[in-house]
Amino acid sequence: MGLDAVIAEIKEKGRHEAETIVNEGSARKDEIMNAAKQEVEKIHLTVRDEVEKNLSHIISQEEAAAHLIVKRQVLNAQKDLMDQVYKQALDKIVSMPESFHEEAITSLLRKAKEEIPKGRVSCAARDEKILKNVLKQSEFSAYTFGSVIDTDGGIIVESDDGQLQVDYSYRTFLNQVWESGLKDASDSLFA
């Protein structure tokens, strides 16, 4: 399963959850609006002249408060959902089969080679065996195994002199993709 398919699956799930949240928020807004209208009716019956002077003001305040409450609830729910989608995406990537991680490490090392042609490569404990096998390939003969690091996956490459380092960990890569696509994802999920 490719990364695009995983992200598409997660987006679809997020879209369905977002619709549910928006519908619940709309129902809550309607409840608040109904309560506000009932309050206005009580005031209207007891102090008609006063209500006529202040009706527009009260309705505006109640609507603004209701909209603010609903908007805050929806935004909080959207943020929670986006955080869940991010975590699910990372978890899904991390749980991919060994062949995926081997392809990813090979691809990331080729990309790092453009910036650091020789150096040490570090990875997660789970990927140590995979990385050592990849480093045996002739195209990566200028690299040595660095160390096991605390990461979800991917690699960190450091030049031999320690002057340069590129972080191609899954989390860093996903953060870059996430930040660049966050608006698109948000628009897609909550449109």
Curated annotation (Swiss-Prot):
**What is this entry's stated membrane topology?**
Peripheral membrane protein
State if Ion transport is listed as a keyword. Answer: yes
**Gene3D superfamilies in UniProt:** ATP synthase, E subunit, C-terminal, F1F0 ATP synthase subunit B, membrane domain
The question of whether ATP-binding is a record keyword is answered with no
**Predominant location category:** membrane
Q: What processes in GO biological process is this protein linked to?
A: proton motive force-driven plasma membrane ATP synthesis
A single GO cellular-component term from the record reads: proton-transporting two-sector ATPase complex, catalytic domain
| Compartments, as annotated in UniProt | Cell membrane
Q: Which domain of life is it from?
A: Archaea
Q: Which UniProt keywords apply?
A: ATP synthesis, Cell membrane, Hydrogen ion transport, Ion transport, Membrane, Transport
InterPro entries for this protein: ATPase_E_C, ATPase_V1_Esu
Q: Which GO terms describe its molecular function?
A: ATP binding; proton-transporting ATP synthase activity, rotational mechanism; proton-transporting ATPase activity, rotational mechanism
Primary role: Component of the A-type ATP synthase that produces ATP from ADP in the presence of a proton gradient across the membrane.
The text of the family note is: Belongs to the V-ATPase E subunit family.
Assembly: Has multiple subunits with at least A(3), B(3), C, D, E, F, H, I and proteolipid K(x).
Put simply, this protein is called: A-type ATP synthase subunit E 1
Taxonomy of origin reads: Archaea, Methanobacteriati, Methanobacteriota, Stenosarchaea group, Methanomicrobia
What gene name is listed for this protein?
atpE1
